[in-house]
Amino acid sequence: MLNYIAMYPNQYEGLMNPDIILGKQDTPIEDFIIMAMKELEAIDNIKIENIEIVRDQDEVDINRHMINVNYKKKNIDEIEIPKYKYIADSRYGEIIFTIRVTTNLNEKVITKRILYPIEYNGFYYNNGKRMKAIWQLVDGSTYAQRGKNTLKSRMPIIIYQNRKRIITDINDMKYIVTSYSYALNGKSKKPGAKAKVKFINPVMIYSAKMGYHNTIEFFGMQDIVSIETKVKKDEDLYYYFPLNDMYIKVLKDKFEKYDLVRAFVCMTYNLNSADFPVTPKNIDDRDYWTCRIGTVGTAKNKNLSTFREKGITTIFMIERLLDATTIQNLRLPMYYKSNIYYLIYWMMISFDELRTKSNIDMANKRIRKNEYIVNSSLGKKINENINRLIEKRGKSRLNSMDTLLELFNFGSDIIVSGMRNLNDLIKTDDIVNDNDFILDLAYSSKGPNSLGDGNNKKIATKYRYLHPSMAGILDLNTSSNSDIGLSGSFTPFAKLYDGYYFTPDHEPCQGRYRFEKDLADEGFRKIHGNNFDEYLKYLEKHDKFKELLKYEAIKIVEKET
């Protein structure tokens, strides 16, 4: 009888999901490293000319990664490489980047090597230790908090909604409408202090890129909202709201029917400024709006132009928010994630749908492994270095080749060293038998970009609770001894979609289409396409704003002596 048990049909055998056990669909770690390094090409002075991947560990000279290379030195080739033979068993590959750094006065070609761990039978051998990387359970895209939605990216992208903003028309009638604000996290002046948040009017951001009238069209408000210098005799059809010495003119029926129209009018109304009024001359002046952005959260000054550099730096910071990894993972049409400006617009028009998401529903979660190994160390360091360069850019004495070369002054073993600090996610192997199958299914909600930002006391109790969506995905019999509900094990039957999501449903993104379709049904405007897919193809093909919303060039120009 025992000889035939293996032949007995098992009804659950076909339900086993090898992808979650073996992780074969995970993006290779080399791809994440290349994506992280390519972020440096956001700076016009830097161009990666060649990439060589060395997967054979016998061809990797570990001694090259045991020294700190200062790229500001003139003769890097003269640095002496030690010749040691290490006893510790480690399995590493390396990626060799050939990078050309140029300025208006100088040029230099450097070689940057990045050491990375090679997985062998599900384990890493790092500095003589056998390590196992487990899954990290993170938010799939956005998560909702009181009055705001946050998209997890390189840095959080935060949109606030205020449903009780009061605006007053020229007849002193008050309206309670919805408005949106973009929140940019600033630096705290004191170590450990809470960072200050800048609340910026989104219409101001778009106007700084392409002027106000192009912003009207980008939001789909053409023929609905306009700016007038005087009130016309058509108040039976239009509402008029003051905008300094001008007026916001909006169709009454559309204002009363559509929340998108009311929100746009409110954001425009909030552009009023007693110190730096909006005029017909400056309403489409990008430089004016850039300076206005620079005034947010700063001390008052009667000279608007003094805020220009601050405004440019803020725009650079906004354009640094969205990284290639987020674009790859986000389940949206490319139109809405092609750059940060389209993404902020999507977050506003889809705010209510995103707000209804449950933060503990597994449908709003995904898992990752190679991503956090790279981005928690290399990705984070590159981001910090670029932000530091942006802040230095306005100081002419720091605009030099040395400032650019400082971007590369980090250890080539930054990834393998960083792995040793990810104790919640990368476990040192202490299994005394060959039953390591359970480790392949282990997960943790802790780690980089996780709940509580590394402080478990900040995590609300509700995030430790069970949710109906966890049935069939999480092993309800397994949990952490010290942090209940924050780590455990998946079942081998959990289904995965689009890589590592738990639902086939993509992000809601039809808010603008529904708005345009309603206008078409009223006979007010023609819609292009018979369905959402056709409408989206038309937008992508006839996108006049793509060039207007392209990122500003980050460029270092050396001062001639």
What is each stretch, according to the model?
Residues M1-N435, Y443, L466, T491-A494, ...:
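N-terminal non-catalytic structural scaffold regions of very large proteins
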Residues I431-A460:
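Active-site-proximal "nucleotidyltransferase
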Residues D453, I484-S487, L496:
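Surface-exposed, glycine-biased beta-strand/turn segments
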Residues N106-K112, S450-D475:
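Flexible, glycine/threonine-enriched loop-and-boundary segments that flank and lead into catalytic domains
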